[in-house]
Amino acid sequence: MNIRENINSIKSGFHPSFWVANIMELFERLAYYGQATLLSLYLRNHLKFTEIETGQLSSVFGGLLWLLPIFAGALADKFGFRKAFSFAFLVLAIGYFLIGSTGIALFSGFYANFDLYWVLIIILIFTAIGGSFIKPSVLGTVALTSKTETKSFGYAIYYWLVNVGAAIGPLLAFLVRDSLGIEFVYIVSSISCALMFLSTLIFYREPPAKILENKDNLIIVLKKLFTVITNFRFIIFLLIFALYWVLFWQFFIVIPFYVSDYISPNAPIEIIISIDAWAIICFQIPINKLTKNISEKNAILIGFIFATFCWLFLFIILPSTQGIYTNILWWKNVSLGIPIIMAAIFLFSIGEQTQAPRFYEYIADLAPKGQEALFQGFAFLPIAIAWGFGGTVGGWLYYKFATQANNPKMIFFVLFGIGVLATLLMLIYNYVNKNKR
């Protein structure tokens, strides 16, 4: 089969709405990750919140953004993906604009009449509600617009585009922040989502009516959630795994603070954090091949160990790099701390790529027979739990050890300790449950 035949085969394997939905998802991810890498700095450095307040605000936004899709998916099924996309992008466009407007001088007189903390709580909740409809709508579209023989490839395209957005979004944010100011990153994210709102109205068509059977309404979703959270063994696993994601989210809380305070407020934090996504794009396939014979339990433990070692690496090495500058290829006179942090994030990413593909297999093994799909549908709860607490934890740690005690390396030691605890708990969990199904 030649290249043209391959392209035609791919095109014919998907309904046009598949491509529209995935392109819109790409632009949504560009908007999301562009602003997410800077949210903590925007709240603290630009809006002058404390680290604790910044962590709390980040927790509200991130926690809801990962929790609400459980319920948003049922509503998207009920009202249709076109309406869900339209609602999501309209709300995101308004929400990102409002977040950015809180830091623009033109609107300062208006916001001076209110407590900005609670204003942002409302805005962030509003924005998270809109964002929660994206993932179920895109995944639902992929499911309904792919042929049986192309469905797996369709999901691969979706996940690849998500990582492309996570890699390129921060780079665009860096360019905007450097040329216009940090507040305008949110305006650009707003414009991106507004364009996708128009794209939905113009290009997106509801998928063909081979609608999934037995769609769940909100009552059924709540019943399923109750079934899951009353499974003690599964909930313990989710709580342990949430510790892993708490470590990950500190790249968006602790690391931006540290880079701004101890390296340079003008350092390209967006580029630093995007290393995780670039590593996934470049190394996910070879790592999958190298680790395909490792058991699910061991793959997850490897992920935990890499995540733990990442913070130990920073604890030992990063403080000694202060005041040392070097040249890296075309990057001249750069603080040595920057490549050290990038190396730590890369280490974390290797572990993430090892455990992530096996995570759903592990959950299938944990689930009672006949309920594998149900339990996998709630597999992202650890991310929601981790964001819900991780932002607040990270903000508090930084305030106590860096702002008050001027001893930031202790933050890395505490995070290392959390990693050790998570790894030990997972080892104990696997031992206790090794003969259970």
Language-model regions, residue ranges each:
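Central cavity-lining transmembrane alpha-helices of secondary-active solute carriers
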Residues: 59-74, 274-287, 385
